[in-house]
Amino acid sequence: MKLLILTCLVAVALARPKYPLRYPEVFQNEPDSIEEVLNKRKILELAVVSPIQFRQENIDELKDTRNEPTEDHIMEDTERKESGSSSSEEVVSSTTEQKDILKEDMPSQRYLEELHRLNKYKLLQLEAIRDQKLIPRVKLSSHPYLEQLYRINEDNHPQLGEPVKVVTQEQAYFHLEPFPQFFQLGASPYVAWYYPPQVMQYIAHPSSYDTPEGIASEDGGKTDVMPQWW
């Protein structure tokens, strides 16, 4: 039993590691390892801190870039406002000038309109005169009523004690006295009846035999007389 216990102890002792031989190496390498650890920690801190700094820097840059266009927009807006105000002033000045020009041109336009109306009126008068001149001259021989009126006009002047006026056929066609001409002669075959004082004197007076005569009856006692028209 004792031998077995000894053999077990020896085996355990042999199986254990030899620590005393390794410790000096560890102790020699300890400072280097500490420095390396510190360096590694610094590197890790830098690696951790750098993204935050980069983020802040990027944020600042973005803010700056955003502020720059806003400033540019503000400048552009001010320039636009100034240009709009200047253009509006120009438009107002141009409109006022146009109004002044129109006010100045109004009298001239009215004068031109009046001249135009007068010219139209004169043209109408000339056309009316030309139409009167171009009216066909109808001979009195083709209108016996006109001949009769012409003769009556000539006969009435000596009776009234007025000087005889020389009247041509054309004047007799357009003007007959003593009545003014309100219509065109020759338009109707019964024109002569519109001149009763001149025409009635040539109407035959009723003769004596046209008067009614009483016819007495054979019976003398009766006094009734019956008129009879022939």
Curated annotation (Swiss-Prot):
It is found in: Secreted. Residues 84-96 have a biased composition (Low complexity). PROSITE patterns: CASEIN_ALPHA_BETA. GO terms for biological process: response to 11-deoxycorticosterone; response to dehydroepiandrosterone; response to estradiol; response to progesterone. Residues 1-15 form the signal peptide. It comes from the Eukaryota. Keywords: Milk protein, Phosphoprotein, Secreted, Signal. Its main location: secreted. Mammary gland specific. Secreted in milk. InterPro entries: Alpha-s1_casein, Casein, Casein_CS. Coiled coil: none annotated. Residues 60-103, 211-230 are annotated as: Disordered. The keyword Secreted applies. One of its GO terms (cellular component) is extracellular space. The keyword Signal applies. Residues 60-83 have a biased composition (Basic and acidic residues). The modification Phosphoserine is found at residues 33, 83, 85-88. Important role in the capacity of milk to transport calcium phosphate. Belongs to the alpha-casein family. PANTHER family: ALPHA-S1-CASEIN. This is Alpha-S1-casein. It comes from Camelus dromedarius (Dromedary). The lineage of its organism: Eukaryota, Metazoa, Chordata, Craniata, Vertebrata.
